[in-house]
Every structure is written in structure tokens, then in C-alpha cells.
Design a protein with these regions (language model features):
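Conserved small/polar residues in nucleotide/adenosyl-binding loops
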Residues: 199-202
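ATP-grasp fold ATP-binding core
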Residues: 3-9, 35-51, 77-91, 96, ...
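Flexible glycine-/small-residue-enriched beta->alpha junction loops
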Residues: 99-149
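Glycine-rich phosphate-binding loop of ATP-grasp-fold ATP-dependent ligases
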Residues: 16-19, 41-68, 95, 117-119
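A long amphipathic alpha-helix within ATP-dependent nucleotide-binding catalytic cores
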Residues: 145-187
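Catalytic core of tubulin tyrosine ligase-like
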Residues: 71-75
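Preference for protein termini
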Residues: 1-26, 33, 37-38
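Conserved protein kinase catalytic/activation segment
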Residues: 194-195
């Protein structure tokens, strides 16, 4: 479930919006008090395409939120849990991933200042926009690896530090699960300059 993915991300230091899991209508008031309005009601179901199915809704006040929650709980999709999550004001998106270079047997950090894109298409049409940094597996991730990636993406100052922290968290996740690919597409940057993961699968 999405809420479990986000808990795992937070444990590795990856930033996610404030959220409260509710299992019934009686838990909504407490969640709204903690998260505030506007907020997003996200049905926790093990299927993709939740947005298109109408299972993710933005609500602006308690009255409309409760009516929406009731509709979601009573829907045909067998919704038993809702993640009540703060709504964020998005300014831009960036792309981050970590994978293994099978030829050199090194870990590759990949970043692009344009997120929400198909990275394979961008690699074919505009490869200069993609920044790649290789990390020796035995050596591990160093500060200069992270700096080379963020500077290469044109990120500096506080935002560069935040994205650098996300890269470190993603690297920890990648190594902890012995993964072949760890990807954030997109990492959202809010209008007040905060990096944030909004979506996880499912």
C-alpha cells in the first residue's frame, strides 16, 4: 500500500507530505485536525490508476471531506483505508534514479532537472539534460558524488542540499533492498522551495 511505501521512505530520510491513515469515518476529525485543509483523500487499494478511477480526491473543508470519504468507503473498489494527506503547491518536478551499470559494475546516479518525463525518450532526444554520476560499489556514496549530481542538474543552495539529502536516502533504500533500480519520477518541488515525494506505487 502507498502508506507503507511512504513509511519506508521516511525511515530512509526521504521527504513525504504529512499524512494520517484512517480506517473509518470516526477517525476523520482527528486526521483533519492534524493535516489541515486543503487536503487529499487517497484510497489505499492495491491497484494502479487510482486517480483515473476517482479514488484520489482533493477536499477543501470538513463538510465536503466527510461526504467524499463516505463515497470512497462505500465505493465498489473495496476501500478500507484512506490516507489523509496535506495538499502541496507544486512549482516544478525533477527526476532521480539509481541503477547498476552492468558493463562497469558500478552504481549510476541519474538526475534530470525536468521530471515527469519519459527518461528513455529524453535520453534519445536531448541527452545533455541527463546527468549521470558513477559510484564504485566498494567505495560507496560520497559527498562529491551527490554534489556532482545536484550541481550538474543546476541545483544549488538550500534546494541543492534538500535534493542531495533525497539522493542519499534513495541510495540507502537502493542498497538496503539490493535493488536493480530505484526511481523517483517525479520529485516535486513546492512553491516554498521544499522537495517532496507525493506519489508512490501502488
Amino acid at each position: 500500500f502507498e502508506y507503507q511505501s511512504k513509511e519506508a521512505f521516511r525511515e530512509k530520510g526521504l521527504p513525504t507530505p504529512k499524512g494520517v491513515l484512517v480506517r473509518g469515518m470516526d477517525e476523520l476529525d482527528g486526521a483533519f485536525a492534524e493535516v489541515g485543509f486543503p487536503c487529499v483523500l487517497k484510497s489505499q487499494v492495491l491497484s494502479g490508476g487510482r486517480g483515473k478511477a476517482g479514488l484520489i480526491k482533493v477536499v477543501k473543508d470538513a463538510e465536503s471531506a466527510k461526504a467524499t470519504a463516505k463515497t470512497l468507503f462505500e465505493s465498489e473498489h473495496n476501500v478500507r483505508m484512506l490516507l489523509v494527506e496535506e495538499a502541496v503547491d507544486i512549482d516544478r518536478e525533477i527526476y532521480l534514479s539509481i541503477t547498476v551499470d552492468p558493463v562497469e559494475s558500478k552504481i549510476m546516479l541519474i538526475g534530470c532537472a525536468e521530471g515527469g518525463v519519459e527518461i528513455e525518450k529524453l535520453a534519445a532526444t536531448d541527452p545533455d539534460k541527463i546527468v549521470t554520476v558513477r559510484v564504485d560499489i566498494a567505495e560507496g556514496l560520497g559527498g562529491y558524488h551527490v554534489n556532482n549530481l545536484t550541481y550538474g542538474m543546476g541545483l544549488s543552495g538550500d534546494l541543492g542540499k534538500q535534493v542531495g539529502a533525497v539522493v542519499r536516502g534513495l541510495y540507502k533504500t537502493f542498497r538496503a533492498y539490493d535493488a536493480q533500480l530505484a526511481e523517483i519520477n517525479p520529485l516535486f518541488i513546492t512553491k516554498d522551495g521544499k522537495a517532496c515525494l507525493l506519489y508512490t506505487s501502488p
